[in-house]
């Protein structure tokens, strides 16, 4: 199996010239064309930025609503003690709604059946105790991604419609999924453009010189394909 996978990866890479640069649509269509996985891979984008993430004002992190969703059914857990907020969250499509008293039993489990936690600010006292467990899994709620909020129902609606979370790593590169391979290419382009334009608008004032260094797209298991920067 490993040999077959290695061969597939080599074949996919052989179809991409590292020096070639494509329009966003061309890059996405090529990524889909050379995909060899038998499952519906994510279509990922990597945006390399001229950032010094040691500086607090250059640590980009947030979430953006994608016009055509992510193609993924996101399971959302809402944490709140407010009865009205609990009902509103359920009506909005939350998969799980728990109070502060109920959270420990859920969070102490080895495996979780949810992708995102949306929390009322008051719940952070409880959730903070599980930071070492939730943080590495990317599950700790954060105001910058809209997952710490006094309006959990609205956050649930946005997550269910499809939001892309983004965060610059230590090297200043933002990795995000903008949809699934099975989605229409033009819709994937519009999703990717939404993220790119959002990142451009968030350029820190302290950044000097070229801001966006390069952009690549790929499927989950495919090679990176360079995109022209406008």
From Swiss-Prot:
Coiled coil: none annotated. It holds the Pfam family Ribosomal_L1. One of its GO terms (cellular component) is large ribosomal subunit. The keyword Repressor applies. It comes from the Bacteria. Keywords: Repressor, Ribonucleoprotein, Ribosomal protein, RNA-binding, rRNA-binding, Translation regulation, tRNA-binding. One of its GO terms (molecular function) is rRNA binding. SUPFAM superfamilies: Ribosomal protein L1 (SSF56808). One of its GO terms (biological process) is translation. PROSITE patterns: RIBOSOMAL_L1. The keyword Disulfide bond does not apply. Belongs to the universal ribosomal protein uL1 family. Binds directly to 23S rRNA. The L1 stalk is quite mobile in the ribosome, and is involved in E site tRNA release. Part of the 50S ribosomal subunit. This is Large ribosomal subunit protein uL1. It comes from Metamycoplasma arthritidis (strain 158L3-1).
């Amino acid at each position: 199996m490993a040999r077959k996978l290695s061969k597939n990866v080599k074949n996919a890479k052989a179809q991409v010239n590292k020096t070639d640069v494509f329009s966003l649509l061309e890059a996405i269509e090529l990524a889909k064309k050379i995909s060899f996985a038998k499952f519906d891979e994510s279509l990922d984008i990597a945006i390399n930025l001229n950032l010094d993430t040691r500086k607090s004002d250059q640590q980009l992190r947030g979430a953006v609503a994608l016009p055509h969703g992510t193609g993924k059914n996101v399971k959302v857990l809402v944490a709140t003690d407010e009865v009205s907020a609990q009902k509103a969250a359920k009506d909005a499509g939350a998969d799980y709604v728990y109070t502060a008293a109920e959270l420990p039993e859920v969070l102490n489990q080895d495996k979780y059946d949810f992708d995102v936690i949306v929390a009322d600010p008051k719940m952070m006292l409880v959730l903070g105790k599980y930071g070492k467990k939730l943080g590495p899994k990317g599950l700790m709620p954060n105001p910058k991604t809209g997952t710490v909020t006094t309006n959990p129902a609205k956050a649930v609606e946005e997550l269910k419609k499809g939001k892309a979370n983004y965060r610059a790593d230590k090297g200043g590169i933002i990795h995000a999924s903008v949809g699934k391979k099975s989605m229409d290419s033009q819709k994937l382009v519009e999703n990717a453009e939404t993220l790119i334009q959002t990142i451009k608008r968030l350029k820190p004032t302290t950044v000097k010189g070229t801001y966006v260094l390069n952009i690549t797209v790929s499927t989950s298991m495919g090679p990176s394909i360079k995109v022209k920067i406008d």
